[in-house]
């Protein structure tokens, strides 16, 4: 087992933390019970979880639901780290990530150019995680250091789009960074 191999479990994962296309909206109280269950199961297995990842594979998260759920978790378990796994199915993924950033979340799942999806989401519009390059760009503009090179991420996103042969949902790969736009503007003025 993972324990026999010295692989500690450090994170619990709460699936569908913000809602489900089959069950509908899930109450904060239900999610808190699931967090408690994850914490209890870890202790029974001989581990202490350092964090909980809240997942939203079906795209239900909004800034308000992120604020409400993280606030409730932090009021009950202030020492627990929180990570977010957000999909942009309904166009609120980046806004939900922004809310998480404002609340001090430092771990986010993202995918190049928004690759991925949720095959069990019961909707035709289930897209992948928030776009890595879009999220890194937003962080950079906010003064949050990610250690990522946004220009290189844009190159990789364009390659990914070529490989899959269809448009992918990334934005900054089309619009470019503000740094690049400002440089182009200065060149035009100088000419």
Model region roles, listed by residue range:
Residues 1-191:
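Catalytic cores and adjacent flexible loops of soluble metabolic enzymes
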């Amino acid at each position: 087992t993972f324990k026999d191999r010295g692989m500690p479990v450090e994170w619990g994962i709460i699936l569908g933390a913000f809602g489900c296309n089959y069950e509908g909206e899930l109450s904060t109280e239900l999610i808190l019970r699931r967090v408690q269950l994850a914490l209890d199961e870890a202790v029974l297995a001989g581990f202490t979880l350092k964090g909980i990842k809240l997942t939203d594979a079906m795209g239900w998260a909004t800034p308000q639901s992120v604020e409400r759920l993280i606030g409730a978790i932090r009021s009950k378990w202030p020492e627990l780290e929180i990570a977010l796994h957000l999909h942009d199915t309904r166009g609120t993924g980046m806004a939900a990530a922004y809310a998480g950033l404002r609340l001090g979340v430092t771990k986010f799942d993202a995918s190049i150019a928004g690759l991925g999806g949720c095959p069990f989401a019961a909707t035709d519009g289930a897209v992948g995680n928030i776009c890595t390059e879009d999220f890194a760009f937003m962080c950079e503009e906010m003064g949050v250091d990610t250690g990522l090179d946004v220009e290189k991420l844009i190159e990789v996103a364009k390659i990914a789009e070529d490989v899959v042969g269809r448009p992918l949902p990334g934005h900054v790969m089309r619009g470019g960074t503000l740094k690049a736009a400002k440089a182009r503007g200065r060149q035009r003025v100088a000419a």
